[in-house]
Amino acid sequence: MKLEKDKLYICFHKPQGLLGYLITLRTFGKYAHCEMVLNDYVYYTNPGGARIKPFIYKNYMDIYEIKLPFDVDYFIKQFKKYQGKGYDYWAILLSQLIEIDIEDKDRYFCSELCLILINKLMDDSLTYNLKSIKANQFSPSKLYKYLKFMEIIGEKE
């Protein structure tokens, strides 16, 4: 799959392993992971931390264009603030599987980082239930539903 240059996408993954299936089971959704895609690179966090790698399409991915005006350099600059930060295992367990509100400002999980980056593109103006966004409360499936509801993403690519 070839994506358009200088367009920002969010890529949602269907589960591939035990943790992914547990996340989708607990969150009543179909997605276990998500990441941002820009100019053939993936901007993501997983157990190796926040980093960038070349994008390779796999059949378990659903990709949506982010329908927001944005500047490529600004997006990359925002991501670099998080690059190298660790993966938040505890938040995955506690906030996604058990629903205890826990957050580590130096560690992030996938949907948390994606929502933070999207919110930065909107000058931190996103709200949920009339309150400021708490990105650590969004699973990949909840993020997908929220972005669809807010019309930030459209149809699958």
Regions inferred by a protein language model and the residue ranges of each:
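Glycine-rich catalytic cores of cysteine/serine-nucleophile enzymes that process amide/ester linkages
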Residues: 10-69, 94-102
